[in-house]
Amino acid sequence: MSDTIPSCEACRPDAEKVDPAKLEKYLSQVPEWRLEERNGVQMISRDYKFKNFALALEFTNKVGAIAEEINHHPELVTEWGKVRVTWWSHTIKGLHELDFAMAKRCEAVFNA
Amino acid sequence: MSDTIPSCEACRPDAEKVDPAKLEKYLSQVPEWRLEERNGVQMISRDYKFKNFALALEFTNKVGAIAEEINHHPELVTEWGKVRVTWWSHTIKGLHELDFAMAKRCEAVFNA
């Protein structure tokens, strides 16, 4: 068995950005997530609310664990009672379908 | 023994903001930290760099632990290879001397 870290499909230089029609469809599947743009790069993000800092940090760690599993990493903003998760694909400077799959996994982790 | 969560001295409504003279002195003691302002609220922040996501998240957890200990919480932005720590005192909408003490503790954690 190889012990190489699996490469993330969304992080390949030839990975395809989600096209506008699919973007709309995918966004409708994660209604709590909003589309944003930073320096021309499209991203999706959601704020998750918690009762205290410890629960927020626990969620950050859970999302960190799925990120490590897939080797695709979000930005995680942890504060007292809140975690903002933002997904995008650095290499293609935009959104890959994996970003939406990861958003769905975040929903599953939060609702578990 | 009381099991009440200790209140953070910087989070009392009558806590004092650091005055401009002290601000300059305190900033010089944490030269890696920069002063910033969001919506009129002064904050201090530093980007810490790491070799991967796991090490970044580990640092986030270490800073989270000292935050819980003091019951004063920063904003922690965790990404692949980077953690941005930002301290300020929400209640007084600015910087308390405790924010600088916490910045120093972050330095100690990072350099340990």
From Swiss-Prot, chains A, B:
UniProt GO BP: tetrahydrobiopterin biosynthetic process
CDD domains per UniProt: PCD_DCoH_subfamily_a (cd00913)
GO molecular function: 4-alpha-hydroxytetrahydrobiopterin dehydratase activity
Catalytic activity: (4aS,6R)-4a-hydroxy-L-erythro-5,6,7,8-tetrahydrobiopterin = (6R)-L-erythro-6,7-dihydrobiopterin + H2O
Entry keyword set: Lyase
Domain of life: Bacteria
EC number: 4.2.1.96
Alphabetical list of Pfam families matching this protein: Pterin_4a
Record has Cell inner membrane as a keyword: no
SUPFAM superfamilies: PCD-like
Keyword presence, Lyase: yes
Record-linked InterPro entries: PCD_sf (IPR036428), Pterin-4-alpha-carb_dehyd (IPR050376), Pterin_deHydtase (IPR001533)
Family: Belongs to the pterin-4-alpha-carbinolamine dehydratase family.
Protein name: Putative pterin-4-alpha-carbinolamine dehydratase
Organism: Hahella chejuensis (strain KCTC 2396)
